[in-house]
Structures are given as C-alpha cells and as structure tokens.
C-alpha cells in the first residue's frame, strides 16, 4: 500500500544541560522536499502508529490548536508557520512534565487509502555503530521510527465530514501511562472522545442480553459468543474495526429481531464501527481469574464438561489435569 505525503516538516526540541534544564526549539525555515525516502519514513511511522494502543479525543471549544488547524484547513495560513506554532506550543507544554527530554518534532500531512491525516510526533534519536568505506567503526545516530509513544493523529477527512464526531483525534497512550494522555490532552486542548474499552464491554453485555432474550441454552449461547469472537478476531487481524451491521449479519436472528436492531431498540449507545480491544473480547470464549495465589483460565466450552462448577459450595472441579501441571505436582509431592 502506498502513502501520499503532501506536506512535511521537521523541527528539533533540545533539552539544555544543568541543574534546571530547559527545552529549546530549533525551527526549519522551509518544508522538506517530498522524496521516496520521506514517503518510506512516513509509511513506517503510519504502520507503527496503527499497531499501537490509542485513545480518542475531541477538541474543546477554546482549543487554540483547533483554531490554528482550522485556519490551515481554510487556507488562511501556510503549513510552515502552522508547524512553527505547533512546535512552540508542544515544547512549552512538554516542559511541564518530568519525562520531557526533547527529540525530533515531525508534523506531516498525508493521504492513505483515500483518507487525509495530520500526523504529529516527537521521535527520539538512538546511537549505533557503522563501518565506513575505510572499514573504520564510527558512531552514528538515527531516528527510532518504530519505537515512539509521543504522537497523535487527526483524521482530517473525518473532521471535515462530521465535526461532531468523537473519533477524529487519536493519540498513543504510551508506556509512561496516563501522563502521556494528559500531555496530549493539554497540548491540543482536547478532552476524551470515544472510549473503545467501554464500547467493547457494552458490546459484550449486548451479546449476552441478546442471547438471554432469545432464550438460548448455555451451549447455544456459547456458540453465538464464539461466532462474535471469531468475527472480531478476524477484524483485529486485518486491522479493521468491528462493524455492527456486519456482525449482525453473522449472527442468528432471535425472536424475529436481528442483533443490530436489538442494540438500537435497547439503546446500548454502541457506535456503528467499534475499535476492537483484544483483552476485552477474550472473555467471549474464556473464563479467567486470579486471587489468593491462584490463577485459572480455561475455554468457556469446557465448563460443564471437564470443569464442574458447584456454585453452592464455591468449588470448581477439574477433570483431567493438564499434563505439565500433573508432572509438576508429581515431582513435588
């Protein structure tokens, strides 16, 4: 798949040394020329971003960033001065956080699969070694474009079509945790938008309720949940979202009501397209839990066969232990 870069610029944010380090910006005075190397770099950044855990946001009414972005989209300003303003705002906001260390600031407008995006990221540099033409070993630095967690992306196409959307802005949650989310919320003057975790949990509840109102037996319910899981797993593997209408077509109609109609009538508040969350969806086909030194996980279809639950006595009986567990028990008896 190809990527079409329309405008891109790099700036530097440096951290000064000393007892009270500060962040300084070094701004380019022209845009980067679009070359195969530039487009290959952006394709790798795009692919890496696609694979990362992301949160969704929307701009606040008073967002200065949103106002400047709107001026750019309305062609009231050019990309370069817009990027200068963004770099200064990012540096000013980043300086408030203890993880601030500077890096290469990338701001790029590109098109991928008929969708326009604005990509903003702060990329670290890494040190490595190279062998030159004289077979001497020298140090070199390179942009770490696969491992980064300070980045956001705005779906300009989505924003143009529906300014009331709750999913046009995404940003990486990051290994630093909530602080990264707070940082980008403040930098963009944004607030939480779509909540994928909540949407997935609501979807699972809707599936259970759908089976209940259809008066399905336990085996039939497990089969429906397995169908849901297989569909969602396929969407995850292909990098696609859960389409409620497609999922509904894959499930049986119960009491003359299909799944999509059921969710609308019961007002679950589900989006038509839901970003899948793998860990949440696992509960469709697995039971798992831990506590007091015990961790248990098993496939749902084994309940009532190899695993017998006695709710009254609060016990779970396992018929046929896993071979490796049995061997460990035998060695340590």
UniProtKB/Swiss-Prot annotation:
Its main location: cytoplasm. GO terms for cellular component: bacterial nucleoid; cytoplasm. It is found in: Cytoplasm, Nucleoid. Belongs to the YejK family. This is Nucleoid-associated protein APJL_0454. It comes from the Bacteria. GO terms for molecular function: double-stranded DNA binding; single-stranded RNA binding. Keywords: Cytoplasm.
């Amino acid at each position: 798949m190809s990527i079409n870069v329309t405008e891109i610029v790099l700036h530097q944010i440096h951290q000064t040394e000393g007892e009270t380090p500060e962040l300084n910006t070094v701004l380019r005075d022209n845009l980067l020329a679009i070359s195969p190397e530039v487009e290959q770099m952006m394709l790798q950044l795009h692919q890496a971003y696609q694979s990362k855990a992301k949160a969704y946001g929307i701009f606040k009414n008073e967002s200065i960033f949103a106002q400047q972005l709107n001026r750019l989209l309305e062609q009231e300003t050019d990309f370069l001065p817009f990027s200068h303003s963004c770099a200064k705002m990012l540096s000013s906001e980043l300086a408030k956080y203890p993880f601030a260390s500077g890096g290469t600031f990338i701001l790029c407008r590109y098109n991928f699969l008929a969708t326009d995006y604005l990509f903003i990221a702060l990329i670290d540099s890494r040190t490595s070694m190279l062998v030159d033409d004289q077979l001497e070993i020298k140090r070199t630095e390179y942009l770490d474009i696969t491992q980064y967690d300070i980045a956001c992306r705005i779906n300009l196409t989505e924003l143009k079509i529906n300014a009331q959307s709750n999913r046009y802005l995404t940003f990486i949650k990051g290994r630093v945790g909530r602080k990264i989310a707070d940082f980008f919320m403040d930098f963009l003057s944004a607030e939480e938008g779509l909540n994928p975790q909540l949407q997935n949990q609501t979807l699972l509840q809707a599936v259970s309720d759908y089976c209940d109102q259809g008066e399905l037996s336990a085996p039939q319910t497990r089969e429906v949940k397995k169908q849901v899981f297989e569909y969602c797993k396929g969407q995850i593997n292909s990098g696609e979202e859960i389409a409620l209408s497609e999922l509904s077509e894959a499930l049986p109609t119960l009491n003359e009501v299909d799944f999509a109609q059921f969710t609308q009538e019961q007002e679950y508040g589900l989006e038509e397209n839901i970003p899948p969350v793998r860990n949440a969806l696992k509960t469709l086909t697995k039971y798992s839990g831990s506590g007091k030194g015990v961790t248990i996980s098993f496939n749902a279809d084994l309940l009532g066969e190899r695993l017998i639950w006695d709710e009254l006595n609060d016990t779970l009986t396992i018929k046929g232990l896993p071979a490796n567990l049995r061997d460990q028990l035998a060695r340590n008896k």
